[in-house]
Every structure is written in C-alpha cells, then in structure tokens.
Regions:
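Conserved catalytic-core segment of nucleotide-activated headgroup transferases in glycan assembly
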Residues: 1-37, 41-42
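Acidic, amphipathic alpha-helical patches
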Residues: 48-51, 112
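Short alpha-helical segment that forms part of, or immediately flanks, the ligand-binding pocket
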Residues: 52, 74-80, 93
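Acidic donor-binding loop of glycosyltransferase active sites
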Residues: 53-69
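Nucleotide-sugar-dependent
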Residues: 64-74, 93-95
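Short hydrophobic beta-strand element within catalytic cores of glycosyltransferases
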Residues: 82-87
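A charged, aromatic-enriched C-terminal amphipathic alpha-helix characteristic of glycosyltransferases
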Residues: 107, 121-157
Length: 157
C-alpha cells in the first residue's frame, strides 16, 4: 500500500508519464489504477531468466526493506544498472553499495514519489553498464567464514 500510494503521487507529478510502464514482480495481483490512465501491472513470479530480462529492460525500481538484514532485490537491481529506491532499516543502509541505490530514511509516499521523479527526470535512453561493486558480483567464496566457525565448534565438541 505504501508503494502504491507513492506511485500514485509520482504519476500525478511526472510530466512524461505516458512514456512509462509500471510493473510489479512477485506475488500475482490485479492491475492497480494509479491515475492518469496508468496502471501497476503485475508480472507475477518470474523465472531467473525472466527476472534478468526484466531488470535489463528497467530504468527505475522501488524495493523497500522490511527487516534488518539486507534485502537482495535492491542489490540485484542496482548491479543491473537499475536506479533503485530502498530504505534504511535499523542499522542497515545500502547507499554505499553502489551509485544506483537511493537509500531513504523517510519513506512517506510523498518522499518516495519525489525521489522517483528525480530519477525519472534524469532518464537516459542508453544507460552505460558499469561493473559496480565487482567483489559482490565475482565473489566465489561468499561464505568462507563458515570454515572458521566449524573449526571453533569442533574444538568445543
């Protein structure tokens, strides 16, 4: 409901709104009227290939965190070059992950809409693809610390 309220405010403000398609991925839902002839269209749950294709074709996204651990969708969107709005939660702030992430402390619908408008007003047809946060993308040993934990636990057994 929060994101829908923000999208409705953004639709009211965005001058070139007819140029934008607004999608929702995840749980399937009926289309949602956002005003000015625009609808939030559900694409439902996507395969990994469909998800990657959607990210490749997207310019902006919103993915809010609802728990203190980092949410993967904002990270995934950002490495695909999508400008993504997310929020801080407790001690988590993803703003330093890369320059495609806009991390908000204030997630009121009007504040989200304002940030989305800024992003969309700076739209460029061709978005240069840069390797952002290469360590995150290439790290083959993400859970290297598990070996150390096992050694500690085995010592105590």
């Amino acid at each position: 409901k929060l994101i829908v309220a923000a999208l409705r405010r953004w639709v009211e403000q965005q001058q070139d709104i007819e140029e934008w398609t607004i999608l929702s991925a995840g749980e399937q839902h009926a289309k949602v009227d956002l005003g000015r002839g625009k609808y939030l269209q559900s694409v439902g749950k996507l395969t990994l290939q469909e998800y990657a294709k959607t990210l490749e074709e997207s310019y902006a996204g919103i993915s809010l965190m609802a728990s203190p651990h980092p949410s993967y969708p904002p990270l995934e969107m950002s490495v695909f070059g999508v400008k993504v709005i997310t929020n801080t939660f407790a001690n988590k702030d993803l703003k330093d992950f890369n320059s495609n992430i806009v991390s908000l402390n204030n997630i009121s619908p009007s504040h989200i809409a304002k940030e989305l408008k800024k992003i969309c007003d700076n739209y460029r047809m061709i978005v240069p693809h840069e390797m952002t946060n290469q360590e995150y993308c290439d790290n083959e040993n993400v859970f290297d610390f598990i070996k150390e934990i096992k050694q500690i636990l085995n010592k105590d057994a």
